């Protein structure tokens, strides 16, 4: 597995996912870099389906940011660039970051194909302010990405780094899969939001309180897997509050009102509201 502090581009040379002899025992935060091998990254947009996802989300994130007067945005989990591109097209000043070099490269190429030049950087959230300078109006962490942090110490450290990178009145937007419903009632999905590709399936292969192992199956019969931590909604809200964030508002599938077990995904919007100006 490539080390976070070692070769920054090691995963670009990886051809296959490798979970060793006991995949369910692989529960380390640093594993995400080895999971997103280039062959998986190249297929990621089939899973998302940019057009369908844009239709399902509508103007949600654009409206949230505009309503609060936010302009300078840090996308800390840019993936293949979907949200960075949508926000750039809407006129926001976007910096796009990801811990995985293959994702950063793909995001840049996707933007270039749309006549946009992304400001990209490879950055691990746990050392975010080492790799990215300046303060931002908003940080977005989307695509169920926060779930890649397997240790609580890493979650707290990442939230502290997000807090430090925001301006005094900045906001943080984090989304997550509805793991509460999966843990308590089993898996079901409307397949309407986030992973909108209708030829691709994404479903849990194994779930316990400390691991959600998802399998992604593509039309060419290729399969990939991700080991993630099943974040409960109120647990993440508690971590955000303890990191200093206030007025945390949670949406279910982009709606303000919802039944707890119904949404496929939650979106948390929180404010820094530090009394001291920069």
Regions found by a protein language model. Give the residues of each.
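SAM-dependent methyltransferase
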Residues: 171-239
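C-terminal lobe and adjacent flexible extensions of AdoMet/dcAdoMet transferase-like proteins
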Residues: 235-278
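Class I SAM-dependent methyltransferase "Motif I" SAM/SAH-binding loop
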Residues: 77-81
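A short SAM/SAH-binding and catalytic strip from SAM-dependent methyltransferases
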Residues: 137-153
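Conserved class I S-adenosyl-L-methionine
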Residues: 2, 6-7, 11-71
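A short glycine-rich, Lys/Arg-flanked "PGG" loop and its adjoining helix->strand segment in the class I
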Residues: 156-168
């Amino acid at each position: 597995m490539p080390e976070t502090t070692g070769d920054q581009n090691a995963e670009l040379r990886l051809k296959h996912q490798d979970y060793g002899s006991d995949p369910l025992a692989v529960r380390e935060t640093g594993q995400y870099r080895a999971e997103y091998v280039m062959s998986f990254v190249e297929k990621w947009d089939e899973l998302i389906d940019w057009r369908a996802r844009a239709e399902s989300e509508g103007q949600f994130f654009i409206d949230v940011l505009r309503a609060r007067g936010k302009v300078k945005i840090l996308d800390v989990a840019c993936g293949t660039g979907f949200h960075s591109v949508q926000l750039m097209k809407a006129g926001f000043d976007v910096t796009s970051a990801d811990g995985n070099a293959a994702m950063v490269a793909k995001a840049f190429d996707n933007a270039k194909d749309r006549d946009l030049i992304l400001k990209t950087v490879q950055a691990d959230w746990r050392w975010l302010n080492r790799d990215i300078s300046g303060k931002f109006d908003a940080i977005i962490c989307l695509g169920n990405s926060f779930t890649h942090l397997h240790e609580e110490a890493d979650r707290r450290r990442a939230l502290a780094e997000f807090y430090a990178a925001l301006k005094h009145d900045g906001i943080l937007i984090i989304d997550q899969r509805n793991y509460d419903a999966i843990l308590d009632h089993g898996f079901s999905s409307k397949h309407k939001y986030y992973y909108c590709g209708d030829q691709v399936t994404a479903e849990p292969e194994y779930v316990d309180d400390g691991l959600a192992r998802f399998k992604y199956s593509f039309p060419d019969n290729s399969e990939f897997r991700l080991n993630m931590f099943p974040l409960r909604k109120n647990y993440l809200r508690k971590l955000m509050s303890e990191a200093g964030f206030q007025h945390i508002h949670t949406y279910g599938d982009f709606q303000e009102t919802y039944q707890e077990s119904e949404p496929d995904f939650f979106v948390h919007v929180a404010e820094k509201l530090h009394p001291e100006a920069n």
